[in-house]
Amino acid sequence: MAIDENKQKALAAALGQIEKQFGKGSIMRLGEDRTMDVETISTGSLSLDIALGAGGLPMGRIVEIYGPESSGKTTLTLQVIAAAQRAGKTCAFIDAEHALDPVYARKLGVDIDNLLCSQPDTGEQALEICDALARSGAVDVLVVDSVAALTPKAEIEGEIGDSHMGLAARMMSQAMRKLAGNLKNSNTLLIFINQIRMKIGVMFGNPETTTGGNALKFYASVRLDIRRIGAVKEGEEVVGSETRVKVVKNKVAAPFKQAEFQILYGEGINFYGELVDLGVKHKLIEKAGAWYSYNGEKIGQGKANATNFLKENKPMADEIEKKLRDMLLNNQDSTPDFTVDDNDGGVEETNEEF
């Protein structure tokens, strides 16, 4: 016991010295950390929030969203911004691709008058802006669109055709080391949009990879693979995309789940359509033939009419959403619209035919 008491005294002295040198909170017992419950922001898709396990994207962390062209990457991040703004949070969009459409952003519910936007000239400038905003503690959500467009200064000042091996990867690696701690301290969510490239000469396995080196893969708490798997049609007219998102890495809940939802052109994620689908699946909404009803009240004939009814009756939609979140997020053994994939968390191939 005497040895234990001596150890306790030595530990207390060491902790006191560390806190004196580096400040209070620089070391603590894990159970004393009041930030253990991760705060989240909704993605705008109920099935994706449930697939993520925590109810959305985690604050104070780095998130990577990648996929092929026109798969819905920017749309998903704009929906996250809209949800964050509705919760009273401040958001910034680093538009490295110089392609953000403010009209489309407004249609998705983004308050563009209060959205901070930067169109940096170089990758270093973009990442320095991210770091400055994170250190300020005044910005809650940062989006970088995209990693592939973060061009190192040396490459911009050089000639086309010059070789710049590993420059972008080194830049990203250094930025991740600086950003990770600042994001945690300020509880800022940083979302990187990324593109897919093909590795040359891969005979077996998946040839797909993401740009910017490996650092982002390690530092990201959540990685989402988003793909277009089909079209949404009204008659012969294509009005949207059927979209599948796979959670290929998740440090805040169980990974490898997936969600499917519709992205409607000019409207964004078909949230009320998800409510109908998940409500029927989990027996909150009754379906008899083509008719849908909730608590004995008919809400529409056909999914489109039921969706429009919920859109116009927000209290009922909010009630269904709350019941689904309570049922599915508090019981992580249940799997709604998604399945578990046995992969290693990398980019994976999909053989969907459109």
Curated annotation (Swiss-Prot):
GO terms for biological process: DNA recombination; DNA repair; SOS response. Pfam families: RecA, RecA_C. GO terms for cellular component: cytosol. Keywords: ATP-binding, Cytoplasm, DNA damage, DNA recombination, DNA repair, DNA-binding, Nucleotide-binding, SOS response. It is found in: Cytoplasm. Residues 331-354 are annotated as: Disordered. Coiled coil: none annotated. Residues 339-354 have a biased composition (Acidic residues). ATP binds at residues 67-74. Its main location: cytoplasm. SMART domains: AAA. Disulfide bonds: none annotated. Can catalyze the hydrolysis of ATP in the presence of single-stranded DNA, the ATP-dependent uptake of single-stranded DNA by duplex DNA, and the ATP-dependent hybridization of homologous single-stranded DNAs. It interacts with LexA causing its activation and leading to its autocatalytic cleavage. Belongs to the RecA family. This is Protein RecA. It comes from Cronobacter sakazakii (strain ATCC BAA-894) (Enterobacter sakazakii).
